[in-house]
Amino acid sequence: MDIRELIDITELSSIATEGPPPPPPPPLLQPHHSALSSSPLPPPLPPKKLLATTNTPPPPPPPLHSNSQMGAPTSSLVLKSPHNLKGQGQTRKANLKPYHWLKLTRAVQGSLWAEAQKSDEAATAPDFDISEIEKLFSAVNLSSNSENNGGKSGRRARPKVEKVQLIELKRAYNCEIMLSKVKIPLPDLMSSVLALDESVIDVDQVDNLIKFCPTKEEAELLKGFIGNKETLGRCEQFFLELLKVPRVETKLRVFSFKIQFHSQVTDLRRGLNTIHSATNEVRGSTKLKRIMQTILSLGNALNHGTARGSAIGFHLDSLLKLTDTRSRNSKMTLMHYLCKVLAEKLPGLLNFPKDMVSLEAATNIQLKYLAEEMQATSKGLEKVVQEFTASETDCQISKHFHMNLKEFLSVAEGEVRSLASLYSTVGGSADALALYFGEDPARVPFEQVVSTLQNFVRIFVRSHEENCKQVEFEKKRAQKEAENEKLKKGVYNEN
């Protein structure tokens, strides 16, 4: 018969005699070799309400044996809620799963937590049964063999080492997924980061590390952990490795910038050179200039005697309106006619698109985007310089980082200065291109200029091809008519 049954029998006896309840039985002593010797027995349950109450209080329980640990429970084994726990002070028989909250250390005046501290507010929360909580939220399954019939002790399974989770469950899970893709130990991973070694880790992995840098709250939680760090989960251990490095998130961002720097600079330089080449090719094409003059003459001929006549030039977007004016039979546009005249009188101008080989590529580049990338690169380099300065006073762990960063900066700063100079030159060339066609660069940006020119080239080439097909078609039709006429004459002569 266990202690709880003894207590129930005692209570029933007290009810029947209407006297004060007897003292609870002393705890049973267990041999030192027993499997239960390390866990003290629970204290007696509070007595139930008696049918006939007396003024005599129940005697205190007898003193515990000197070898028992019930007199000095540790904070790791006893639930310490201030109220609302049934059997407060009961010994926990198992580790419980944590509730990943962010606790407040101070009740702000006027908050509900301050109100809850009042004695009259404490009773509003329901009572919690410790045994039920242990049953539902135990971190490991409780062994049923330790409390089987008659106190018989069965063979206990070897306890599994349970990992301690301090980080919110979903975040820890996602972090461990990320870490599963990194095939090197965590200390070696951080050593590669501090060495700025791009052969071990790529930019995507570095960016993922940045996403999982511990927050201020998580850092405080980990720093406050006083248990065995070997029992922490992989996410927590990863966070601890990160926290060993001063300003770890800034260093990771510097590493990410370094990895991407050369490819970004190469792309920027390629785009700027394409724009520079396109502007020089367009402005240097004498064939395009003569075609523009031919269009001006054609337009003045059509608009003679009207307000549109006697023009000294035209806006660039007027090039695309050459297809709007059609012949009386609607079979030919003004663009077709321009191509026809050039083919007959100035055939050497028809291949003017070959003078502007960079034009099409330039239409795929946004000068505004290049400006934003250029600014981002400059600001990124400024942050690298700031971290380089800050790492001078770091501990030994940042020594290699500082040394490798110095080598990178010696190259990167020169690259950015060269790029800034090229950008300034290209910006001036882009504005000059709009001015070349008599446009205001503020109203007609570079992108609009090259887009209009490329569309004009495309329509011009298509119209010339259509003219050539039409000429070939008419030539074949004339030959066929001539053959038919010849056949008719032959039949007539025979008759």
From Swiss-Prot:
Domain spans labelled FH2: 86-486
Composition skew (Low complexity), residue ranges: 30-39
Biased composition annotated in UniProt, kind: Pro residues: 19-29
Intrachain disulfide bonds: none
Annotated region described as Disordered, given as residue ranges: 1-92
Family recorded in the similarity comment: Belongs to the formin-like family. Class-II subfamily.
Full protein name: Formin-like protein 17
Taxonomy of the source species: Eukaryota, Viridiplantae, Streptophyta, Embryophyta, Tracheophyta
Gene that this polypeptide is encoded by: FH17
